[in-house]
């Protein structure tokens, strides 16, 4: 749920 989709979807 943020900008880094590879860390937090």
Curated annotation (Swiss-Prot):
Cell compartment(s), UniProt: Secreted
Domain of life: Eukaryota
One GO BP: neuropeptide signaling pathway
Keywords: Amidation, Neuropeptide, Secreted
GO cellular component: extracellular region
Residue positions where Phenylalanine amide is found in the record: 9
Recorded family membership: Belongs to the FARP (FMRFamide related peptide) family.
Name recorded for this polypeptide: FMRFamide-like neuropeptide AF5
């Amino acid at each position: 749920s943020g900008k880094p989709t590879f860390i937090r979807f």
